[in-house]
Amino acid sequence: MNLKLVFESGDPVLIGVFVLMLLMSTVTWCLVVLRCIKLYRARKGNAAVKRHMRDTLSLNDAVEKVRAVDAPLSKLAQEALQSYRNYRRNEASELAQALPLNEYLVIQIRNSMAQIMRRFDYGMTALASIGATAPFIGLFGTVWGIYHALINIGQSGQMSIAAVAGPIGEALVATAAGLFVAIPAVLAYNFLNRGTKILTQDLDAMAHDLHVRLLNQKDS
């Protein structure tokens, strides 16, 4: 489609459609790049944390080794150990007497996991919304363009194939633009959603390991 012609024609609706498409595409690719970098760093850091946790018998020593690692598993391990220490320091409190260590750790670890995962959820709603709405916005632009093309053709009195095919063909590209924006957004959403699920599985496994080791902890 001749976008220059669209902008020169001054039709505010078509201009708005293509500007919106451009913004949605920009947001999509920015989110894809930022989220991919974040997931890559998280996976790399988690691999280091797993290695230290596996090779170190003492949980206290393992947590100290991974403290400097910027990774979700490192944060979970630190917060779980801190929760254990807080419980032991306040065993005489009413909360400690009413809530066994086992249940207390489950609650605290689950809360930590939820807070960590919130950091990896940003942008997913935007990608899903763009993937779902972009084709319809493009279709709206096409319908609008065809409508005005037919009006202009009727007013000019030129009903030849060439006169009809040109303006309508240009209007149809708005739908293609919508698909061009939507397809990367949908693919990115699925890819990032898969990465987030893998991260959640790693957190679940680490949470179970921390829970068992803390229950068998002899000292804090």
Swiss-Prot record:
Involved in the TonB-dependent energy-dependent transport of various receptor-bound substrates. Protects ExbD from proteolytic degradation and functionally stabilizes TonB. It is a multi-pass membrane protein. GO terms for biological process: protein import. The chain crosses the membrane at residues 13-33, 126-146, 168-188. PANTHER family: BIOPOLYMER TRANSPORT PROTEIN EXBB, PROTEIN TOLQ. The accessory proteins ExbB and ExbD seem to form a complex with TonB. It comes from Neisseria gonorrhoeae. Pfam families: MotA_ExbB. Belongs to the ExbB/TolQ family. The gene is exbB. One of its GO terms (cellular component) is plasma membrane. It is found in: Cell inner membrane. Keywords: Cell inner membrane, Cell membrane, Membrane, Protein transport, Transmembrane, Transmembrane helix, Transport. This is Biopolymer transport protein ExbB.
